[in-house]
Amino acid sequence: MAEQLALVIGCIIGGLLLLIGISCCLWKRLCTTFTYEELPETADTATSSSFSKKEERPCRYAGIPSVRLPSVPFVVPPSHQGRDWVRLHGGDWAVAPQDPCPVPEHITCTSSPAAGQTSLPLCVMGSINPELYKSSEDVSEAGFPDGCLGRLWFSVEYQQESERLLVDLIKAQHLQVPAETCSTLVKLHLLPDKRRFLQSKAKRKTCNPQFDESFIFQVSSKSVAQRVLKFSVYHINKQRKHQLLGQVLFPLKNETLAGDRHRVIWRDLEAENLEPLSEFGDLQFCLSYNDYLSRLTVVVLRAKGLQLQEDRGVVSVFVKVSLMNHNKFVKCKRTSAVLGSVNPVYNETFSFKADANELDTASLSLVVLQITEGDKSYPLGRVVVGPYMYTRGKELEHWNEMLRKPKELVKRWHALCRPMEP
């Protein structure tokens, strides 16, 4: 009985092994009937047309007569290894000739200590991967306006937990240097602190310097929204003296700090205003009128030299913009308040509905006010722009230039006049 049982088990095992062997043979024969072809790096017309001229291959299956099937071209995508890379005009790299899209080169981030400034920390942040940085405007490297002093690219991020402001200084272009050779550096201030600053490394023999440096400012979360980041671009002359080429003022507002650090920001350089301050300070703003939309736009940029009333308590300043018609109030809007600065920066835009036939009797009143104790406001200065009926001098010129240049932002400084007592 035991011998019969062993014989049955042996037969079963032998049968299973035989079936496995037959299955393996059939699988191998089936796999050999298909061929895979990899296209060369550069596919030409002759190669692509050769598929139609391939001879038919026999396909045999077990127990089935030979059947001749046309070959099916299977394409393996070519790899990018071995491609030629060419350098573009803007300093980027691209694959030639198959891939015309530029691929940015990887940049190294370095540390640049400020001379004699130990209280503001500066450290190496690692390599900057340009693919992570998204430019907010597509025309950032084109369309330099007439009289442009240069353009600066940077990014900012505020880390709430560690109370650190991270600034990436990326590059500058189209710098206007009063010399044959250009050697530039950038100083970074966190206003209103003008004494301490951080400084980049000097870039020599180029008007389009690539900095790729990271800086850290330690600043409280309570005051960071009131701060202004200032970039000052200098040219180093033969006497090793620093000559200012232009500056960028970037307010650190909440909506700015909440953005993505990898979003690249660019700003055009502005010349330093060397005109003497007025008695009550000065206000800079832009005017624009869109006749198609019947929209009057005011951009409040900054003020300087304000005469703050320290004895009235809290020192924070805002600007109230009012649209008047026949000296009657129509509508008003106000900027956010900036704390503790006689040179506040706003960069806020307001729009008013105004028909073209109303511009001869309309005017704009901009009043700078200081917030005092009890949420009361005290006027520091005032300026009115409008037609000949209400204004003269620079204020009238600004209004007329706005009308001559529709849909364009016309920017000017204006001296504040004596405020009206509340």
Curated annotation (Swiss-Prot):
Q: Which Gene Ontology CC terms are recorded?
A: exocytic vesicle; membrane; plasma membrane
Regarding the membrane, this protein is recorded as: Single-pass type III membrane protein
Predominant localisation class: membrane
Record family assignment: Belongs to the synaptotagmin family.
The compartments listed are: Membrane
Organism of this sequence: Rattus norvegicus (Rat)
**Topological region Cytoplasmic:** 28-422
Name this polypeptide is given? Synaptotagmin-15
For this protein, the record's SMART domains field holds:
C2
Q: Which residues lie on this side of the membrane: Extracellular?
A: 1-4
PANTHER family xrefs: SYNAPTOTAGMIN, SYNAPTOTAGMIN-15-RELATED
- Whether DNA repair counts among this entry's keywords is no
